[in-house]
Amino acid sequence: MFPDTTRIQMLVDKVQDFLGGWLEQKLKAIHPNGYWQSAVLAALDERQRKIVKEDGSSCPQELDLPMQVSVFRYNWPSLLETFHLNRQLYNDAVAVKQIRNKYDHKKRNAVIDWERYHHDIETIYLFLNFYKEKPIKFVLSSFY
């Protein structure tokens, strides 16, 4: 039996929800006058900006996870300096994006072994643990 990848998707959705809200709060604090232009849209490539415009997105919660991680990475120096974050958070954000891509773009008959699956869940957990949200622990407890 192979791992149920819908659990990974559920966790990735949690990351997207939390990261979007967190980015909005932190970026507004760093850029009180126009964070959307200077901190969000500036972080996206031309294709991503076109998608944002077509979708009518106006806050980080409305961006997909790869875009959120792009915004996070672009603003990392300011976030790190202003909020004195753990540097590991940067690596964890990149890893979560890679996990999302792996499961979203998985071939139909691709086999994901249990060890890799549990490692991916643990990586997402470590990233979400930064937010110290109680619902995360509840969701994760059902995976083990």
Sequence positions of predicted segments:
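Amphipathic alpha-helical interface elements
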Residues: 1-144
